[in-house]
């Protein structure tokens, strides 16, 4: 029997009378890398926001590692790192302070975790800069470090290469 990390079953999402997602079902096995493809307005971001627990489905069920997200959202969110397309970063904070704050919120040791993610995400050159001064690409790197901070089992990236310099896409 295959174990699924994400199961989406007959999920729909309405915004008033507008149906943004209509009866979507899919399963993603553990260890699988997938992409949601479709035109603008197809419901990709809405689907990701439901999987991450930021939005509740109007209909259907979502399971994260076998756990119903509607019944235990905290446990599900602990398993997910999410990098939204436009990350809600604190622009007036210095990158290093911001990442240490995120580490603290996740119960991680900032002195151990932040240097590791700084190296992994290519942030060495900008650690002492204000987030508001960063290029879009570097802001996305900070957002990725944020998403990775608690060693999530699932990493969800919404348009991770949008607006990046072609050399940064790696």
Task: Give the location of each predicted region.
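Helix-to-loop junction immediately C-terminal to a conserved catalytic motif
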Residues: 52
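Conserved ABC transporter NBD signature motif
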Residues: 60-71, 75-76
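Conserved ABC ATPase "signature" region
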Residues: 100, 111-126
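Conserved ABC ATPase signature
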Residues: 130-134
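Hydrophobic anchor residue at the start of the ABC signature
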Residues: 144
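Conserved catalytic motifs of ABC-family nucleotide-binding domains
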Residues: 151
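Catalytic Walker B motif of ABC-type/P-loop ATPase nucleotide-binding domains
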Residues: 155-159
């Amino acid at each position: 029997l295959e174990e699924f990390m994400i199961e989406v079953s007959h999920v729909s999402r309405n915004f008033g009378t507008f149906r943004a997602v209509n009866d979507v079902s899919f399963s993603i096995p553990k260890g699988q890398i997938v992409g949601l493809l479709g035109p603008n307005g197809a419901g990709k971001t809405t689907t990701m926001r439901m999987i991450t627990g930021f939005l509740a489905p109007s209909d259907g069920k979502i399971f994260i590692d076998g756990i119903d997200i509607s019944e235990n959202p905290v446990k599900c969110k602990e398993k997910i790192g999410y990098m939204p397309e436009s990350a809600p970063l604190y622009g007036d904070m210095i990158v290093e302070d911001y990442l240490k704050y995120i580490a603290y919120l996740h119960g991680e040791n900032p002195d151990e975790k932040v240097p590791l993610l700084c190296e992994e995400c290519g942030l060495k050159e900008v650690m002492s800069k204000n987030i508001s001064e960063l290029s879009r690409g570097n802001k996305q790197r900070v957002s990725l470090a944020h998403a990775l901070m608690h060693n999530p089992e699932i990493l969800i990236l919404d348009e991770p290469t949008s607006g990046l310099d072609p050399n940064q896409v790696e």
